Amino acid sequence: MDNRPILILAAAHDTTNIVYNAISKNFAVEKVILEGRESKKKFIMRRIRRLGLLTVTGQVLFQFTIGKLLPKFSQKRILQIIRENNLDLTPITGEKIMPVDSVNDERVLSIIKEIDPSLIIVNGTRIISKKILKNIPCKIINTHAGITPKYRGVHGGYWALVNRDPQHNGVTVHYVNAGI
C-alpha cells in the first residue's frame, strides 16, 4: 500500500471541513491548500468570454434571486442532514492549511511536488488548468454537488429537483482530467 499522504485542494467552506474530517480519520492528510475567493467581476468576465452574455446574465439573475433564498429555506434540512450523518464541521487546524490565491498558481505545483501525495482530493475550487493538471504526478478526485454531466455547475441538485428528476440529485465523485 502507498504510504504517501493525501493532499486536499479546496475552497473555504463547511463542506471542506466535512471532507477533511472524514478523510483524516482513516488517512494521513498532509495539507489542505485553500484557494482564495476570486473577485466577482473577474469571475463574471471570464464566464462571459466562455459561455456568452445571455447565459451569464441568466446565471447572475439566478444567484441574486433564488441563489440568495436557497440557503435560508434549506438551513433546517442542512442541519438535519449534518446531524443524521454525524458530519464533523470542526474547522481544520491552522498548521494544516496553506492559503493560495488560486489552485492554478505555480506555487501550488511546487507544494504538490514537495509533498508528493498519493492522491489529491478537490472540493469546491475553480476549474484546474490543463497546465497544472498535466504536471500533477498522482490521481486527482473531485467531489461535485449534482450528478454530472446532466446537471453541471454549483446548483446541479437544485436543477434536478426543479426538473422533477430526483434520481439525478446527488453528489458525483470523479477522477479529474483535462477534459471538461
Label every model-predicted segment:
Residues 1-180:
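One-carbon transfer enzymes
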